[in-house]
């Protein structure tokens, strides 16, 4: 008969010494996996040959993405090995192909007698932002003229417009009756080129510690909405660009559909009406974000203009507003408010008159969100009389003040200005009313 274990007394159980904790607590599976992944990063940074660095880089990025998304790596090492090998080979292969293509490009430049774009001592970037078919490309002559005024020769700056690759990726003439869908057929490929171009600009700038003058003309959703461009190019621009000029092109959404159709007739690239209108919402919702993103930084020096492109083709757009960090001048309040109105359009419209939002949603009082943000973000906002180029009204640190009463009166015939004041500065409006 086995001996029975004597029972401990109540006092003994209450005052029993707690077991000593282990000096090295066991790691959870998740902790072990993340430690392993971080170790791959450390090994990659310390690697002294390109192959090892690429392998560790792929292990860190691929396994890190899986573990972050799923919470663990799973139990299929052969599958994980396969995708990491593919990732590393794609990375190394693309670099090798790029080096060989670079040799051919350099030979072609020499053979054709092209000029290489030199890095600039004080780099300037001009950027056009607007919805698809808003008329950005038609403004290039204006920007080229501005470059000349800044002392930059015609061949002294690079133009970034990846859309030209669509024509080179597809044989449009071979598409026959489906040629209107050509843009769709190459969308993913153009995105790949766009992304590679961003990385190329960054790598070249970091290598040379400089960057040439650039004119950027491209539409893409992440220009407004995502953080991808921030990760890839934002730091490059902040570090190397001295001055940035950004032009926001404001075009009525129904006009972009018409312009897009006419562009398709000439270039063979079409989009659905719904796509054009959807792009408008994306662009006009993103313009304020992009504006405030750059005005919140001290560098580079940042100059912006909002342009009303509802003018006949072949004529320069009208100035809506302009400014820099800390200051904004408004010439045409109605068009500035339109930026918010255009976010409410009907993407399923089948006729031009169906595009705009219902009348009650278009009232000034319901579309002051962007303007109120401007009041908070800019220390000084000036309203400029278009005839005399004189400031007649200012908002200084959120407070309205009349700068020229004689000029304010005729400008109050502008319904948008009067309704804005009725909402935000009713006392000033009543004081300015003729007695």
Mark where each language-model region is.
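Conserved nucleotide-sensing/catalytic segment adjacent to the nucleotide-binding pocket
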Residues: 152-234, 271-274, 284
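Glycine-rich phosphate-binding P-loop
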Residues: 126-150
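Short glycine-/polar-rich loops that comprise or flank the Walker A/P-loop
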Residues: 155-157, 239-245, 267, 299-303
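Conserved phosphate-donor/acceptor-positioning beta-strand/loop module used by diverse small-molecule
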Residues: 238-261
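Pre-Walker A adenine-sensing motif
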Residues: 106-120
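Conserved GTP-binding G-domain of TRAFAC-class P-loop NTPases and closely related GTPase folds
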Residues: 254, 258-434
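Long, basic/Gly/Ser/Thr-rich N-terminal segments
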Residues: 1-101
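Pre-Walker A (Motif I) flank of P-loop NTPase domains
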Residues: 121-126, 211-212
């Amino acid at each position: 008969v086995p001996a029975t274990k004597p029972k401990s007394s109540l006092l003994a159980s209450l005052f029993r010494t707690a077991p000593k904790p282990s000096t090295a607590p066991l790691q959870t599976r998740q902790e072990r996996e993340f430690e392993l992944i971080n170790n791959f990063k450390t090994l990659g940074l310390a690697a002294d040959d390109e192959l090892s660095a690429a392998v560790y880089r792929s292990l860190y990025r691929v396994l890190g993405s899986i573990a972050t998304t799923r919470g663990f790596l799973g139990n299929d090492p052969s599958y994980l090995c396969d995708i990491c090998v593919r990732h590393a080979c794609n990375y190394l292969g693309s670099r090798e192909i790029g080096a060989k293509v670079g040799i051919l490009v350099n030979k072609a430049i020499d053979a054709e007698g092209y000029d290489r774009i030199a890095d600039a001592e004080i780099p300037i970037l001009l950027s056009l932002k607007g919805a698809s078919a808003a008329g950005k490309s038609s403004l290039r002559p204006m920007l080229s003229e501005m470059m000349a005024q800044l002392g930059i020769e015609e061949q002294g700056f690079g133009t970034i417009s990846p859309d030209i690759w669509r024509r080179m990726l597809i044989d449009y003439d071979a598409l026959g009756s489906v040629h209107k869908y050509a843009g769709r057929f190459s969308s993913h490929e153009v995105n790949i080129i766009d992304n590679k171009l961003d990385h190329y600009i960054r790598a070249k700038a970091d290598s040379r510690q400089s960057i040439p003058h650039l004119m950027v003309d491209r539409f893409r959703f992440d220009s407004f909405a995502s953080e991808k461009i921030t990760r890839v190019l934002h730091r490059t621009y902040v570090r190397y660009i001295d001055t940035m000029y950004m032009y926001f092109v404001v075009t009525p959404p129904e006009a972009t559909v018409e312009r897009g159709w006419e562009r398709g007739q000439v270039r063979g690239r079409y989009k659905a009406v719904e796509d054009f209108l959807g792009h408008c919402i994306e662009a006009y919702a993103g313009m304020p974000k992009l504006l405030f993103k750059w005005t919140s930084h001290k560098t580079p020096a940042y100059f912006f203009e909002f342009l009303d492109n509802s003018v006949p083709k072949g004529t320069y757009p009208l100035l809506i507003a302009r400014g820099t960090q800390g200051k904004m001048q408004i010439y045409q309040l109605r068009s500035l408010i339109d930026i918010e109105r255009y976010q409410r359009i009907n993407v399923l419209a089948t006729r031009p008159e169906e595009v705009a939002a219902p009348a009650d949603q278009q009232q000034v009082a319901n579309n002051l969100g962007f303007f109120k943000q401007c009041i908070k973000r800019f220390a000084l906002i000036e309203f400029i009389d278009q005839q005399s180029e004189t400031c007649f009204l200012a908002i200084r640190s959120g407070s309205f003040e009349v700068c020229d009463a004689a000029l304010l009166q005729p400008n109050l015939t502008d319904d948008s200005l009067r309704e804005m004041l009725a909402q935000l500065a009713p006392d000033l409006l009543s004081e300015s009313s003729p007695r």
